[in-house]
Design a protein with these regions (language model features):
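Short, low-complexity N-terminal intrinsically disordered segments enriched in polar/charged residues
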Residues: 1-28, 32-36
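Charge-dense, low-complexity intrinsically disordered segments
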Residues: 5, 47, 100
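Short, conserved clusters of charged catalytic residues that mark active-site
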Residues: 13, 71, 108
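A solvent-exposed, acidic/Ser-Thr-rich amphipathic alpha-helical stretch
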Residues: 27-91
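A generic structural micro-feature
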Residues: 65-68, 101-105
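Short beta-strand edge/turn micro-motifs at domain boundaries
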Residues: 84, 106-131
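Short, cysteine-centered beta-strand-loop-beta hairpins and adjacent loop/turn segments enriched
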Residues: 92-102
Length: 131
């Protein structure tokens, strides 16, 4: 059996809350979007485990000026307590002088997820930069 509508909506909410958490500097919520041994894979950057993810969230927020992650075209598949998510993403941040919002990264998320204790979490979130 495929995912229920409730599961699909919960996964969409997870993706949205992840973006809000990383953009607002809520590193605990950012890390909480992952399973305990979850992995953020951004090519040469590999972050694994809740503590490392939380530290990354703190570092990212202090280095980016007014970041905004925008994910679109979400495609969710799966069954039971396992799922995959694919989405396009653009990141905006203040840049230049005078500062203005600019696209600073563009690419694709390819994710594996698991439902743990009734809540969906990222097992692995892979970000591939557009070439």
């Amino acid at each position: 059996m495929g995912l229920t509508i409730d599961d699909q909506l919960a996964i969409q909410q997870l993706a949205a809350r992840y973006n809000h958490a990383i953009d607002s500097g809520d590193s605990a919520a950012f890390a909480g979007a992952f399973v305990d041994d979850g992995v953020l894979d951004a090519g040469q950057l590999q972050v694994e485990g809740r503590t490392a993810l939380e530290q990354f969230g703190q570092q990212f927020h202090t280095s980016a000026r007014a970041p905004r992650h925008v994910a679109t075209n979400l495609v969710i598949d799966g069954h039971g307590d396992k799922a995959t998510l694919q989405a396009y993403v653009q990141m905006y941040a203040l840049a230049g002088d005078p500062p203005r919002q600019e696209i600073t990264a563009s690419g694709k998320y390819t994710d594996t997820l698991a439902k743990v204790d009734g809540n969906w979490r990222f097992v692995r979130r892979t970000f591939t930069v557009d070439a």
